[in-house]
């Protein structure tokens, strides 16, 4: 994992992310068993539910990051376009781990989405 850690982490965070945040996630990655990481990558690569997006009936919040090289914005747009009741929000100044890099904004957005669903119910 050490051999690929810097490349992977560079996809997870923007260059402006706090160093301690990046270093902590890099350490976590390096401690991950290589076979488990590879199996997870294979599973995600094989997972394709595009043909079922129209079946989603829940109000859906699709969150993307403008600088995400691991899951580019066009993937999020595809999901948002395919799910009938989807809304796409794009975080600037964030990469693949936008929920970590922009934790406060991410939590606020998700909390508002959930609150709105609860109020409607």
Give a label for each model feature.
Residues 56, 62-64, 68:
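Short beta-strand/loop motif that positions the catalytic acidic residue
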Residues 57-58, 85:
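Active-site acidic short loop of glycosyltransferases
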């Amino acid at each position: 994992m050490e051999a690929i850690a810097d490349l992977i982490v560079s996809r997870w965070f923007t260059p402006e992310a706090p160093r301690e945040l990046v270093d902590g996630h890099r350490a976590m990655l390096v401690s991950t068993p290589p076979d488990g990481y590879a199996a997870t990558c294979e599973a995600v690569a094989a997972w394709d539910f595009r043909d079922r997006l129209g079946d989603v009936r829940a109000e859906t919040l699709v969150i993307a990051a403008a600088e995400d090289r691991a899951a580019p914005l066009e993937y999020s747009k595809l999901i948002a376009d395919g799910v009938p009741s989807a809304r796409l929000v794009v975080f600037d100044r964030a990469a693949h781990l936008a929920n970590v890099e922009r934790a406060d904004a991410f939590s606020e957005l998700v909390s508002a989405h959930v609150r709105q669903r609860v109020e409607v119910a």
